[in-house]
Amino acid sequence: MEEKKCPVTGHTQHTPTGGGTKNKDWWPNQLNLNILHQNSALGNPMDPDFNYAEEFKKLDLAAVKKDLYALMTDSQDWWPADYGHYGPLFIRMAWHSAGTYRLNDGRGGAGDGTQRFAPLNSWPDNVNLDKARRLLWPIKQKYGKKISWADLMVLAGNCALESMGFKTFGFAGGREDVWEPQEDIYWGSEGEWLGDQRYSGDRDLENPLAAVQMGLIYVNPEGPNGQPSVLASGRDVRDTFKRMAMNDEETVALVAGGHTFGKCHGAGPASHVGPEPEAAPLEEQGLGWKSTFRSGKGGDTIGSGIEGAWKPNPTTWDMGYLETLFKYDWDLVKSPAGAWQWVPTDPAAADTVQDAHDPAKRHAPMMTTADLSLRMDPIFGPIAKRFRDNPEEFADAFARAWFKLTHRDMGPRSRYLGPEVPEEELIWQDPVPPVDHELIDEQDIADLKAKLLASGLSVSQLVSTAWASASTFRGSDKRGGANGARIRLAPQKDWEINQPAQLAEVLAALEGIQTEFNSSQSGTKKVSLADLIVLGGAAAIEQAARNAGHTLVLPFTPGRTDATQEQTEIYSFAVMEPKADGFRNYLKGKSSAPAEEMLVDRAQLLTLTAPEMTVLLGGLRVLNANYGQSKHGVFTQRPETLTNDFFVNLLDMGTEWKAVSEEKALYEGRDRATGELKWTGTRVDLVFGSNSQLRALAEVYACSDSQDKFLQDFVSAWNKVMNADRFDLA
């Protein structure tokens, strides 16, 4: 075939725009700022004024559920339902949509429908879930923009459970779809499916990962690295579910409850299975794993490689899973696909389970290595026995654990939508008290600002405390933020980064102002400490602007309340302790990732853009908000004055920078002519002069005419962080 040539120039046509060698190929360690600009409006097909929450409120949820119930038993020839019921398939789909969540960074989960996109749509653990989503398409098509894919997948899981006799805890809508893969999520560094280079030492799993192998949701059901060691599997199960925010009881309830339904698929060798959806040919239209084993579907389906059902009635909620688990002794065998699994030693069990497609066939139940850990593990075992002997307790535990699994990344209850939102407040929702008092008005705000500035607290102290309170927010799972004032509670009050001794002094002063104001009111008007902390930051920034000769009035909206210690789950907040915060020039110990990468990661969690990250860091440096009041990056002779000095001095070619150690974590900036020490800075500071994109942004704020823009942009970005968790303002 002749090469195509341009009809104008006669030159050979090359790869279309976007192909070829990329910057990342030349410089693989280049700082990735793209994660700060995901899900641009340019890639969103919805109208600019589209409001998903308002559309969902118009949805007839009962009608959608009726259609889902009907779908459960409407078996399609192109993908027949096991036992004539799609319920188990939809449970797995919903579970695997939600099960990517990990507590450490709040990323993953069911909140944005990313199971539709790579890599999740092609993970080995998600084999054949492409069919589940395709079965849902007619319902999604029918209700359109009123229900997102993210909500529909979770709702389908709930309806599947309900259609098989289980009473769920509730359902909340409000998950808005994204339109592209989430590139900010670190799934591991392995270059092949099921790789496990994520471990070191005595099976220490790399943070923030939760799954044991690349492409798995939780654990390898055959056992660690495919080796059928039951007790070792129990260790993996415990660690993985803990990293996904589940305790031991929730873990047992979820596994036992989920495996009450359906079966595994390993009818033949995996060599018959074709490529995953992202690698499948065009004519497959987004489907993958096409099998050449006999019919390739129904009783010939190949999925995980394990074959069989866990209990006699796979489409009915009952105690069959736990009863079967403890009733038999188990022999290790291999499935027709060659996967390790366990079958009862008792020959009488051989015909206790019906076939999924042929009523004339019967089978023995099976268990995976991970299943047996629920019996043999010294902690899981007693819990599983108690659940077996107390069906109502088990049902309640599974209902609550399933609700937590599928709603964990949605944030506070104020984001929940729909008529099936449970009334009970759960501690993992990070509850805050409702506003039960009159809010402060504009005059009160002005008076309180004056008292804050007259309190003896410095600009630096007020700014640092407000930032420490608000910057815990994570856009990933909508946790953290200034609302609740949890900075005064365990564990946040004791975090190293918050400088506990100084923090205690600041909080004592703020609480004094709060008490004085509240006790002087004749009505119900009050100011919360959460509001006062943010207001203190605003007052300090306004003062810093006045120090620079400018007048600013920062926007402030009261309405935050103060959480109690009883409303704060210490364990789940403890994992949110920053190991690094470049905005405060803080780095705890050594890290495998460069400090500048961790800055970008934190900025992404705060939902900041690259310009917002840039202007915020530059402003915080001159406000002297560093951890420990270090002078690293404080490129100004007038600290606590809101100027663009950080950018001006960083880009000054009169300064020569050199690393002061082999680790290249700290640098000195000396006068090129005299050698005199001018500044010290960290990697986080110097990257704004080194990285070409960040330097371009820094140049904007270093220009002679940029002071007003710098002030406006800093205030805008600051206000964004202060209100990041104010879902009531959206």
Swiss-Prot record:
UniProt-annotated binding residues for heme b: 259
Keywords: Heme, Hydrogen peroxide, Iron, Metal-binding, Oxidoreductase, Peroxidase
Lineage: superkingdom: Bacteria
Site (Transition state stabilizer): 92
Pfam families with a match to the protein in the record: peroxidase
Listed PROSITE patterns: PEROXIDASE_1, PEROXIDASE_2, PEROXIDASE_4
Record-level Gene Ontology MF annotations: catalase activity; heme binding; metal ion binding
Record cross-link Tryptophyl-tyrosyl-methioninium (Tyr-Met) (with W-95), residues: 218-244
Location of region: Disordered: 1-25
Main function: Bifunctional enzyme with both catalase and broad-spectrum peroxidase activity.
PANTHER family: CATALASE-PEROXIDASE, HYDROPEROXIDASE I, BIFUNCTIONAL CATALASE-PEROXIDASE
UniProt protein name: Catalase-peroxidase
